[in-house]
């Protein structure tokens, strides 16, 4: 579902890169004709779609801040991968995660690794843009975000990318006339039938540690609900 939101954001804005987070972990849209209720399930918030200019370095720092909130630093294959709280996940509004899931952004438009053996601020390795060209840390890129994030929500632009909150508005080069949900509806109508596909453009590494750890942590967090898309 997150990758589908990325698809809509990139298609609508013509940005180079998009940032988006999971807005829930317990929503299912069944195959068949989509309803307006399904659209609210897919995107429940009244956010607009914005495009901002960020340097390659700011993009990496943004992602560092995001992943610092939801992965641990693994020192052995037996460690947890996901930052979890000590509350019962079934009764917790963050589904057992230590940080709010709506602040756990991933990126599309780039290919990158998240090395969970590294400490905070040193995990992200951006291998290339989606088209295979190299990301230049000194160059500016057009980045699609929702209006909550563009205003500094979650601190990923301010505490992560290091942009002064007073400067955020000046970084916005385009703001859509409709909510992001409206753009999702337009996208579905234009491209129906929709078969969302995963981008597989990023991964946790080293995979020989992270793959088993992810399975263990999913079971701890969600039990019989099975694996959960992130």
Briefly describe each language-model feature range.
Residues 1-230:
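Catalytic centers of hydrolytic enzymes
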């Amino acid at each position: 579902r997150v990758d589908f939101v990325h698809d809509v954001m990139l298609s609508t804005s013509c940005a180079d890169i998009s940032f988006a987070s999971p807005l829930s972990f317990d929503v299912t849209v069944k195959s068949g004709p989509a309803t307006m209720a399904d659209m609210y399930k897919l995107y429940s918030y009244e956010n607009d779609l914005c495009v901002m200019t960020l340097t390659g370095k700011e993009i990496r720092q943004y992602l560092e801040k995001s992943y610092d909130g939801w992965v641990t630093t693994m020192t052995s294959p037996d460690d947890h991968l996901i930052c979890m709280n000590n509350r019962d996940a079934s009764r917790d509004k963050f589904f057992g995660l230590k940080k709010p899931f709506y602040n756990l952004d991933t990126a599309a438009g780039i290919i990158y690794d998240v090395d969970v053996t590294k400490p905070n601020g040193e995990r992200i390795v951006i291998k290339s843009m989606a088209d295979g060209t190299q990301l230049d840390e000194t160059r500016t890129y057009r980045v699609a975000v929702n209006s909550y994030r563009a205003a500094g929500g979650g601190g990923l632009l301010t505490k992560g990318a290091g942009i002064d909150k007073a400067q955020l508005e000046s970084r916005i080069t385009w703001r859509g006339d409709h909510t992001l949900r409206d753009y999702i509806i337009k996208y579905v109508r234009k491209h129906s039938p929709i078969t969302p596909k995963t981008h597989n453009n990023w991964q946790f590494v080293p995979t020989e540690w992270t793959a088993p750890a992810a399975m263990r942590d999913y079971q701890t967090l969600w039990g019989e609900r099975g694996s959960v898309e992130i």
